[in-house]
């Protein structure tokens, strides 16, 4: 598509990465918008793009102002089968096409307010969990891809996949577009839920057509970077090249198992004590950069101030600060304007780097025991349905939870 008159054409994602630039992604839309009252926890579907476009637009703008130069379409779980899963019935009121189109329009509008690109995103499907065929699952990805092509997104992202098999199917479907593809999996160092190692996952994704690979969601920054290191080693051993991408959680989850934070008993409504500080995220950004990751952002829990922390930490490499830094002194330097002297004494990097942060919850444990049900594709509990979950189905799950807790 020709550039708008008077505006310089934007460089694409691979042009930026080829030039050695750091690309900063956005943060966690479904969690942020759930807290604001626009997304329903449980289905986590993005119909807010149609129902409350101003809320989605504002969050995009806040991420742009914080330093993001990719506006990812709010199309997480926007496949037709997810929009009508377990009694959600969104697709009966608002078609998947309308949700995807609205999300693309909003992302493009905000991206064009700055030097940001638009990425059209697909994610794992209920159909795959229910053992549908490769052809059926790819058809779902192609439905979203048709919208992304019509709206001329700049590149594509296949994100949030627990099984590399489905991620490969997504990449293969998206590859027909001819646009650059990034692929991220929600896995930890143990690999995907079928036991495929991170290194092998990366190799399969690159061979399928992904130019950028990495992880998103499910694990904290530290664990996510451990996984990316294994992916990097796998690619090097196979003599394959790809750019690395990390969209970690903004929660500390050292106690989670193979399923990540969704296995923690606090998920999703009790995670606030685990939120990473802006200083934690600066450390994450530096460690990611040192590992060779050049596409850095966040997923669930990541708010605009977390993205600003990435942009500030990597400002020396990028050569500029984001607009949101105008109201943020580096390492708390703005506290020198505070009325209280003991707060002014905190206006220094050493204070915040060395502070051991208390939770304020003296009777609570610092770690939790993951549920670890161990179910994956093919398990009866993971077979999806259009109808709402029945009371009988819920009672069976409650009983299983009691049994697991007693073990």
UniProtKB/Swiss-Prot annotation:
This chain's source organism reads Rattus norvegicus (Rat)
The record's annotation in PROSITE patterns points to:
HCY
Give the pathway annotation.
Amine and polyamine degradation; betaine degradation; sarcosine from betaine: step 1/2; Amino-acid biosynthesis; L-methionine biosynthesis via de novo pathway; L-methionine from L-homocysteine (BhmT route): step 1/1
Q: What does this protein need as cofactor? A: Zn(2+)
Reported effect of changing residue 73 to G?
Decreases the catalytic efficiency
Its ancestry begins with: Eukaryota, Metazoa, Chordata, Craniata, Vertebrata
Carrying N6-succinyllysine, the residues are 40, 93, 98, 232, 241, 340, 377
One example GO MF annotation: protein-containing complex binding
- List all disulphide bridges recorded for this chain: none
The main place the protein resides is cytoplasm
The segment(s) forming the Hcy-binding domain are: 11-314
Report the protein name in the record.
Answer: Betaine--homocysteine S-methyltransferase 1
Q: Which Gene3D superfamilies match?
A: Homocysteine-binding-like domain
A biological-process GO annotation:
amino-acid betaine catabolic process
